[in-house]
């Protein structure tokens, strides 16, 4: 347990574990935050310098710096010029007040039944928290804390006007979206907004399969029947859509999830024509998933931009990929013809995103920080994609594996030739400490077989240094899965 001369007696009650699936900087952040909440690290305590703490803990300076920046962004620490980081005053617990009791120990699990620790996180929802702009975000929030006390009062349920204006301008420039700020609604997550939208929809909804299971669940939970329609090389099948009774179509045209297909301009025009044949009785929900991360080609304009502000398209997007899932800010552009119904149903609702977070994002966008941040992310993620692709092509022979979905988003598909059963691949992934999904996991009908043996590999949270080892581990688990299935 490290202790530092010249500072308050400080120690970590939880040792850092390099073998854990939780990154070291997050382990350090959690441990220090717990000490501050408990009052062990008292208000006004000056934290050790980054190099000194890094040496004490045998970790990199970047690990300590990231943990400190996370603590500062969340208000645990304050940074003073030439004085380093200090524990915030208001964190001290009143005398006599005890911190919350630690949760009871979990029920013991027999070692033979315990899942091996995850060593390679290739899940599709991961992002790299090390790319989060901690310094800029913390500075903008600090400025707001001192200059905008009105943010403590209730705001517009649709979202703060400044953020809706900033989003309207950003979307017009970078996604071709045509809307007024009045058409924008801000909420705590895409699923939340979709749930509010569902009661306004005119009938059954077509959803893609393979596709996003949460979208189907949210729609059905809110009384909208879903029709699961197939995806081909150009996206949702228009033949299947035209033959269905769907009045709504939920699509991910910029980066179909999970296949990675981009819907071409011709298919987009056909989809808009499908909706235009029944004005006011058909709508398209455009989930602009991963449109920010297009590495090798220019993005097509949004469907909403093609249809216009008066068109039948509801545009959905979120900051969970471009910033972080914990930011919990998503937004929706409503067609003008739905504004009246929205206001009538939700005018007494309260907003679900804090005003400080909204104003911070507004300033982050209008100050030009967001576009620079995205450029930095694209560079980092493209390099990581290239490293993972190179690792896969080194570990697998060309006749063993086909890669797809490489040009957009933060995941790719790896289709095995003559694959073992998906159940064997799942078991082997668990055994070898790999967190990933299979394309069949996103089959919403439960009947498709063409997706068998296709791994869906996310690289958003995969450290650059682990790409080569990840390729080798994937080769081992595929070999083990094949051997296990051959013995059955």
Where do the language-model regions lie?
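Active-site PLP attachment segment
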Residues: 82, 306-342
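Residue-level detector of anion-binding/catalytic polar loops
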Residues: 225, 283, 434-435
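Short glycine-rich anion-binding loops that position phosphate/pyrophosphate groups of nucleotides
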Residues: 127, 254-256, 321
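N-terminal basic, amphipathic alpha-helical segments
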Residues: 1-142, 149-152, 337-338, 343, ...
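Conserved core of the PLP fold type I
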Residues: 141, 148-280, 292, 296-310, ...
């Amino acid at each position: 347990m490290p202790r530092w001369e010249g500072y308050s007696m400080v120690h970590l009650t939880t040792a850092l574990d390099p073998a854990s699936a939780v990154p070291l900087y997050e382990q350090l952040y959690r441990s220090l935050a717990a000490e501050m909440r408990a009052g062990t690290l008292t208000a006004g305590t000056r934290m050790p310098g980054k190099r000194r703490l890094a040496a004490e803990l045998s970790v990199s300076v970047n690990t300590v710096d990231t943990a400190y920046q996370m603590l500062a962004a969340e208000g645990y620490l304050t940074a003073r010029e030439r004085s380093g980081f200090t524990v915030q005053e208001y964190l001290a617990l009143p005398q006599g007040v005890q911190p919350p009791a630690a949760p009871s120990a979990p029920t013991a699990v027999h070692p033979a039944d315990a899942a091996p620790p995850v060593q390679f996180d290739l899940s599709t929802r991961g992002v790299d928290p090390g790319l989060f702009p901690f310094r800029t975000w913390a500075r903008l929030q600090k400025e707001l804390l001192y200059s905008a006390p009105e943010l403590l009062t209730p705001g517009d349920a649709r979202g703060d006007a400044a953020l809706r204006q900033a989003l309207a301008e950003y979307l017009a420039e970078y996604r071709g979206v045509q809307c007024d700020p009045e058409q924008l609604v801000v909420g705590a997550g895409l699923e939340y907004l979709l749930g509010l939208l569902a009661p306004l929809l005119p009938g059954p909804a077509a959803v893609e399969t393979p596709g996003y299971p949460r979208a189907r669940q949210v729609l059905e939970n809110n009384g909208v029947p879903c029709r699961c329609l197939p995806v081909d090389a150009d996206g949702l099948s228009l033949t299947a859509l035209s033959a269905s009774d769907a009045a709504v179509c939920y699509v991910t045209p910029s980066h179909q999830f999970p296949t990675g297909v981009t819907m071409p301009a011709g298919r987009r025009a056909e989809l808009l024509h499908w909706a235009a044949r029944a004005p006011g009785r058909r709508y398209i929900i455009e989930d602009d998933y991963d449109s920010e991360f297009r590495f090798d080609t220019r993005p097509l304009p949004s469907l909403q931009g093609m249809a216009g502000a008066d068109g039948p398209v509801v545009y959905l997007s979120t900051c969970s990929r471009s910033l972080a899932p914990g930011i919990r800010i998503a937004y929706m552009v409503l067609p003008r013809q739905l504004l009246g119904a929205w206001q009538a149903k939700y005018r007494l609702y309260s907003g679900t995103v804090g005003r400080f977070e909204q104003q911070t994002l507004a300033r982050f966008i209008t100050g030009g920080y967001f576009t620079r941040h995205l450029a930095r992310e694209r560079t980092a993620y493209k390099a990581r994609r290239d490293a993972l692709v190179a690792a896969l092509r080194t570990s697998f022979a060309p006749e063993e594996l086909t890669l797809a979905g490489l040009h957009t988003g933060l995941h790719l598909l790896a289709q095995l030739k003559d694959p073992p059963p998906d159940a064997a691949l799942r078991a082997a992934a668990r055994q070898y400490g790999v967190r990933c999904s299979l394309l069949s996991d996103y089959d919403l009908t439960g009947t498709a077989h063409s997706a068998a043996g296709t791994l869906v590999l996310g690289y958003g949270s995969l450290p650059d240094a682990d790409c080569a080892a990840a390729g080798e581990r994937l080769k081992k688990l595929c070999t083990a899965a094949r051997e296990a299935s051959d013995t059955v």
